[in-house]
Amino acid sequence: MASVEPIKTFEIRQKGPVETKAERKSIRDLNEEELDKLIEAWRWIQDPARTGEDSFFYLAGLHGEPFRGAGYNNSHWWGGYCHHGNILFPTWHRAYLMAVEKALRKACPDVSLPYWDESDDETAKKGIPLIFTQKEYKGKPNPLYSYTFSERIVDRLAKFPDADYSKPQGYKTCRYPYSGLCGQDDIAIAQQHNNFLDANFNQEQITGLLNSNVTSWLNLGQFTDIEGKQVKADTRWKIRQCLLTEEYTVFSNTTSAQRWNDEQFHPLESGGKETEAKATSLAVPLESPHNDMHLAIGGVQIPGFNVDQYAGANGDMGENDTASFDPIFYFHHCFIDYLFWTWQTMHKKTDASQITILPEYPGTNSVDSQGPTPGISGNTWLTLDTPLDPFRENGDKVTSNKLLTLKDLPYTYKAPTSGTGSVFNDVPRLNYPLSPPILRVSGINRASIAGSFALAISQTDHTGKAQVKGIESVLSRWHVQGCANCQTHLSTTAFVPLFELNEDDAKRKHANNELAVHLHTRGNPGGQRVRNVTVGTMR
């Protein structure tokens, strides 16, 4: 069984002479030689005989499971090192990618970690690049398709609340529409689910289901707004909109963005006179489209919308506990880091001295969202000087401030040269006006929900049929119910733009009960109606 001891000095840069900067490209732009080297490097780190910080098992295990520290067998704490729902989300994952890229470059010194451009037209139309969905590459197992566990993981928190994320040695990571639950109370149902898929669909059809799921999330609700303009909404819209969020604290995570939007939100009172204050845009954090893509690949059931046709899908990307064991995780996060890099460039914040946080704001405390990570006490204020454990640089603890000056990083990004529609070739303009009516959904307590979940917003059309118009996803951990350290920080509030409606129509439809919100969880995939819904604007 894997050790629970932390890796105390995990260096994120190569020692010795100044290294050549890695140039991170779109994976669709790699030539055959570059792709060959990438595959060979991934095979090298996934070699079951490899141990220590160059082993994929240990690299993947830094994010979530196998848990360590207080979170090893105590659900009051988070046993993974990763940060979500706080200001360290972008920088911790930046350090994490550097650690993985360092290991890959030991296998092949000129290899770089590519990004999967989730914003381009090719992804919106066809889904995941083929290199991630083909079982073999040139006659050998493809290391980007799946990972086979070299050791077992035991979920010591399995009895609380109701899910077991233990994984046996030899387990192969899976994606939607498969289920990867292996606990003693789940494995029979998961095997029945997976056997049904294998008996009724071939590999091409299974890949088609996954790609359909991904494209549905990206393309949901492509509207003609009240000004006659085409608006690409939901995940693809969020990817662009997050770059316009100016304040780092708000941009960095969902917890801070929820509070910021709450402060700007003004209800549209039926029959009342609306405020004359200048309209402002809804703040979309970087973490929001990130969450959507995790759930798109992992699977969450939302009836009536082409997001999940098969109840019971539990792909590894769908929960923080095991997401990092799926190789696609790193290409997804490389895209998220490129968005972060682009945001820094757009807002002229390419040096650490140019970025500050809102002190003691929601999203700046260790108990926000997931709970304290190993080495950080409960109710600790987070800053840009908070150590990003377990990462080190020349023996010194890595902090956010050490990773915010772009010219000092050991890598650069190259914009995509093939395809169309990429956000990196068509960066949105700052001060872009966007002020549709906003649906505010509140009263969601994550303490009672095991795992990730989604809120689906539907609108009754002229035939009386409900049509799903928006989804807000929450990437979570299985055992959040037991997090006594973060019980008062588990309230989720969502803000969803209603692009098709003007303010009067939004008020009327809300008053006539034509706008509905349902909460879809693992335990209740059919959805539960949420009543705490308000229509308003951002002022």
Curated annotation (Swiss-Prot):
Cu cation A binds at H63, H84, H93. SUPFAM superfamilies: Di-copper centre-containing domain. It catalyses: 2 L-dopa + O2 = 2 L-dopaquinone + 2 H2O; L-tyrosine + O2 = L-dopaquinone + H2O. The keyword Mitochondrion does not apply. Cu cation B binds at H290, H294, H333. GO terms for molecular function: metal ion binding; tyrosinase activity. The keyword NAD does not apply. Its EC number is 1.14.18.1. Keywords: Copper, Melanin biosynthesis, Metal-binding, Monooxygenase, Oxidoreductase, Thioether bond. There is a cross-link at C82-H84 (2'-(S-cysteinyl)-histidine (Cys-His)). This is Tyrosinase. The N-terminus is blocked.
